[in-house]
Amino acid sequence: MSQGLFITLEGPEGAGKTTQLARLEARLRAAGHAVTVTREPGGTPLGTRVREVVLDPAVEIEPLGEFLLYSASRAQLVREVLRPALERGETVLCDRYADSSLAYQGAGRGLSLPLLRQITAEVTGGLTPGLTVLLDLDPALGLQRAARRGQPDRLEQADLTFHRRVRQGFLDLAHAEPQRFLVLDATRPEDELEAEIWAAVSERGH
């Protein structure tokens, strides 16, 4: 059985990742593909607990500790969900993955990118997406969108300067790996974004 395709959706707060992930899942299933959908942090019992902690506005976490919590969740997700699904030949869709740590804890919090990459390589065993869709959005607009969802979480409460660094971090990652990244303007109509994402997935044999 051939290895499945690993697709991640990335972007700043309020970019519409969850919406496009659901649309892509529906298209893949309609085309007859077996699909596993998950998210970071989350996707496992440990990941769910980590998510509760890192997004809780009442919890203060220093930057390296924050990264290590995400890494613990990621290690569990790779072992329990991602690798088994890919080995079954399934298409895996993940709402955020390692690039989010490089953007948020690296560019955003100022941690050493070489250190983060080294730890991430160990945590993931080198598991890299075949396609990463980056929904790019001005942070001010993204935070406005996110605020409409309700009480902001710990990351959404960070200042605009932090979120601008995160956005630039994502764009720098995409510039460094243009073969893996598809960068889309998240202010475009949802139907247009869905069509471009589907075209990129189809180019990769799906």
From Swiss-Prot:
EC number in record: 2.7.4.9
Entry's Gene Ontology cellular component terms: cytoplasm; cytosol
Positions of ATP binding: G11, P12, E13, G14, A15, G16, K17, T18
The keyword Transferase is assigned to this record: yes
CDD domains noted in UniProt: TMPK (cd01672)
NCBIfam families: DTMP_kinase (TIGR00041)
Job description of the protein: Phosphorylation of dTMP to form dTDP in both de novo and salvage pathways of dTTP synthesis.
PANTHER family: THYMIDYLATE KINASE (PTHR10344), UMP-CMP KINASE 2, MITOCHONDRIAL (PTHR10344:SF4)
Protein known as: Thymidylate kinase
Organism listed in the record: Deinococcus radiodurans (strain ATCC 13939 / DSM 20539 / JCM 16871 / CCUG 27074 / LMG 4051 / NBRC 15346 / NCIMB 9279 / VKM B-1422 / R1)
Source taxonomy: Bacteria, Thermotogati, Deinococcota, Deinococci, Deinococcales
